[in-house]
Amino acid sequence: MEKFQAAMLLGAVGDALGFGHAARESSSLGARVQEEMGKGGGLDHLVLSPETWPVSDNTIMHMSTAGALITDFWCLDDLYREMVRRYVDVLEKLPEQRADPATLEGCSQLKPDNYLLAWHTPFNEKGSGFGAATKAMCVGMRYWQPERLETLVEVSVECGRMTHNHPTGFLGSLCTALFASYAVQGKRLEQWGRDMLRTVPLAEEYCKKTIRHLAEYQEHWFYFEAKWQFYLEERKIIEDTENEASFPDRYDAEEREKTYRKWSSEGRGGRRGHDAPMIAYDALLGAKGSWTELCRRAMFHGGESGATGAIAGCLFGLLHGLDAVPAGLYRELEHQDELRRLGEALHRLSSQEK
């Protein structure tokens, strides 16, 4: 249970750190931010209070997904209706500066008062953003057992598609849900990317059964898979071997910025559903269990650091718990009591059949 609570807390911590860094954009490069952090005593002396280090909609939407997953729904359609209701409800109350425009646009298409079509939104050419990926880790926590894979695929795709109806967007939610389930299962980190890519065809099969106009999707499936294939080849973990991930000899903040931009589709790392989870995964591989190193790689860079931080923080919590994390980062964290409650409930319900 502690690791489930840690996952919810550290997802929010990663979001607050990354979002706060992006908001202080006078220091757009990770190197400069890390220098500033060093002058202030670093992460050990930092206290994340709601006034100075608020969370963004990444955390609010993740909490909304988790909140829906712990309700007493009868069937998955009822779960989706509950997600829609919560997404629309929270975004109406969220200050504009803390909401991602793509997520706001996606939510505007939802119809909470339409019983049959509540979560059915049209294909969206602009729906490829990171917002689907950052709200779905809890889906993998709820359905982490290998025998629940089919449910995980369906729920993560639908959860992502509600707001980001574009394969690059909702395959991001499949990706983060799968990674969370692998963390709980204790799967070797280097294996996650391969196993995720092998699961993408299940999502495609599900979409073929449930979407009338699949033609709009077809060309975009390849992009997500090709980007991940390229990444796994670059890190030399595409094959089923015991190899550790291979990093360049020089991989400091400046080099990482270049690499993250290369992986992106628009020159800003972590903006899309393929590269937000990719940067988080790369940071986990490179951090080797060090929270400080994870922050350097996932929370403090010149891209969408709130998104990559939220994903990386949550997965770190599932892998390692809170022991390596300075207490000041979560002691006064915004929504911390509710995050703990959600983690406890997800843990309890994940062993029950539904």
Curated annotation (Swiss-Prot):
Keywords: Cytoplasm, Phosphoprotein. InterPro entries: ADP-ribosylarg_hydro (IPR012108), ADP-ribosylglycohydrolase (IPR050792), Ribosyl_crysJ1 (IPR005502), Ribosyl_crysJ1_sf (IPR036705). Pfam families: ADP_ribosyl_GH. It is found in: Cytoplasm, Myofibril, Sarcomere. GO terms for biological process: cardiac chamber ballooning; cardiac myofibril assembly; protein de-ADP-ribosylation. GO terms for cellular component: sarcomere. The modification Phosphoserine is found at S27. One of its GO terms (molecular function) is magnesium ion binding. Gene3D superfamilies: ADP-ribosylation/Crystallin J1. This is Inactive ADP-ribosyltransferase ARH2.
